[in-house]
Structure formats: C-alpha cells, structure tokens
Curated annotation (Swiss-Prot):
Belongs to the V-ATPase E subunit family. It comes from the Archaea. GO terms for molecular function: ATP binding; proton-transporting ATP synthase activity, rotational mechanism; proton-transporting ATPase activity, rotational mechanism. It is found in: Cell membrane. InterPro entries: ATPase_E_C, ATPase_V1_Esu. This is A-type ATP synthase subunit E.
Length: 203
C-alpha cells in the first residue's frame, strides 16, 4: 500500500543523479573504445608485415574486449544507480508513518490483511505509536465495514505492540493464518517488482 507512490517519488528524485552517473559511464565507454581503436590501429600497423589477416584479427580482438569492458562498466553503473534508489526508497519508507496520509494507508493495510485471512475473530498487531492512531472507535468502524463486506462477524482485538516500522500484522485467533502487512514485509515482498519499476523508469 502506497509503495507505487513512494517509488515514483524516489525515482523522480533519483533521475538527476542517474543521468549524471550514466553520462559519466557513457563518457568512460567512449574513452575505452577510443583508446582501444588507437591501440588496435597501432598494433595493426606493427604486425602488418606479418600479414593482413593477423592484423585484422588483432584489431577485432582488441575492439571486442573494449566493447565488453564498456558494457560491463555501464551495467555496474546501472546496478549502482538502482541500489542507491532502493536505499533512498527504504529511507522514505521509514519516514512514511510521519506523513499526513499515513493513517489512510494504515487503514487500507488493515482491511487488506483482514481480507486475506478471511475475517472472523482476529488479533491486530501494530507498533506502539500506531495503536494510538487506531483507537477503539476506529477499530469498531473497521469491524463493521469488514462484516458488511465479508458477510461474516469480524472482531479485531488489539494484540501486543510489535517492533515494526509501520503497517500491521493480522492473525486469526487460532494462529493458523497470518497476514504480515508491516511496511518492511510489504517492501520485501515487492522488492523484485520495485527494482523492475525503477529500472524501467530510469533506463
């Protein structure tokens, strides 16, 4: 919940940095290729007396190695940019509970968790601060809304405070079903798709 919005914001902030890094990488790529061409030309002339075929093979080998080196450099810079963006995304995730829209995000995560375990008698686990946000009247309203949606009596009992950044964990009373919608668990579950989205937007 809210992951796409956060990702888009961080990716937008990272674009300038990415452009700079990639520009440097491209310049280095050109320098590598230019140097390789000069080296190839020099060696080609040096061994020209041995035969045109040998000279051409040497030239092609040097250029192929240079292209491979340049490609490797670009891939390294791309991964570096993605990693920096992910780190910024994680930093922003930690700050999310301080934002005005966080309560709405938290409510949606609770509703999603209740849906995933199927309602009924449930235990709601939050961090200490979020238990202050979800007061008894909010909890009652959530129960009523979920009963109407699921057509099933749903009771949300507050459990112990957990050491999570934010979000929620929902458990059935018999502990057989658990929905971990903590912010960190949600981030980890979506890490591959977030990486793909960052790569798509930046490159």
């Amino acid at each position: 919940m809210g992951a796409e919005k956060i990702t888009s914001k961080i990716v937008e902030d990272a674009n300038k940095n990415a452009e700079k890094i990639l520009a440097e990488a491209l310049n280095e790529k050109e320098a590598i290729l230019t140097e390789a061409k000069e080296e190839a030309s020099t060696k080609e002339q040096a061994i020209a007396k041995k035969g045109e075929k040998d000279a051409e093979m040497t030239k092609n080998r040097i250029l192929a190695e240079a292209r491979l080196s340049a490609k490797k450099k670009l891939l390294e810079e791309r991964e570096k940019t993605i990693q920096l963006t992910l780190e910024k995304l994680e930093e922003d995730l930690v700050k999310l509970p301080q934002k005005e829209e966080y309560k709405d995000i938290l409510l949606k995560m609770i509703i999603s968790g209740v849906y995933s375990v199927g309602g009924g008698e449930l235990e709601l686990l939050l961090n200490k601060k979020d238990f202050e946000i979800i007061d008894d009247s909010t909890l009652w309203a959530l129960e009523k809304e979920m009963e109407d949606r699921l057509k099933k009596v749903t009771v949300l009992k507050k459990g112990e405070a957990k050491s999570i950044i934010g979000g929620c964990i929902i458990k059935t009373a018999d502990q057989t079903k658990v929905s971990d919608n903590s912010l960190e668990a949600t981030f980890e579950r979506n890490l591959d798709s977030v990486r793909a989205k960052i790569a798509e937007m930046l490159f």
